[in-house]
């Protein structure tokens, strides 16, 4: 647009200031009034889009929006992390597959990017973290809160550990708390940890005593009083690691996984073979999966390393439907129940009912059942719920 404007300007200048011999005697160019509006234009300054940083840490810093506060509790947490650099190194190494998505989703919602670091506090970025209070996953959802935010939990999978759904649910929860506490992110974070009712109760106590209602003035549990300062301390360390003599290993500002449709239930050992990845990688990208296959009712998708997607799709397209999940024909014996048979084959009663179109639990000796079963040995499904429980 600028080039067109300058061309018109030059044309008009030449027409009015010509120095050619006899120019004053030459006929003057007249512009019809109806053409004048079409010649009006405006020069718009060119503002190039800022280049996206190659390093995810830098992208994260650019989106900081929480207040930068100085408080003894923050200093205490800072000092602990500085004394334990190995802890942060291990945690940020675990974060690498997940952090880019967490940052991208926070950016999409327009919320402070420091919130993408909350799993450092919640789970040390361990997707299988499980607390004594039964909180689970990167974002440590309790069972009831998870259900409230649409995270399904059953025998086949626990979406509190789902990388995509749990991240989205956590941000929605935080946004809800942010609105509830009238735009105060620190109170929203406190409520994420201890519940909005407990934070509101502490505010009412302070109100009766004529005290301030901000986070650092409230009398909360010891855990919650340390929770928010921990996040603020981690954010400060990420902002300026050199000031604390810490080295953050570079994280690429690029997706670390892709979402790939499976088109139906799929044995995880088969999926790992198709994608040419080890089972631990597959489970760590899909930690919601409790068993040896994806959920029969979906979602029919897997997260895979970006460089393995093409191999997986090619292999899946050539896979016969009968190879997706292995089946065995079981003859019911006297005294057997669906629960006994399900336990034997590491399946579920619901899966047996669905596969055999049973309305109830009544079965008869001598009849045959089709039973879905794993295609590999138990040991290969190293991070299934059964295998994890045996290690604890």
Please identify what each model-predicted range represents.
Residues 17-110, 115:
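An acidic, Gly/Ser/Thr/Pro-rich helix-cap/linker signature
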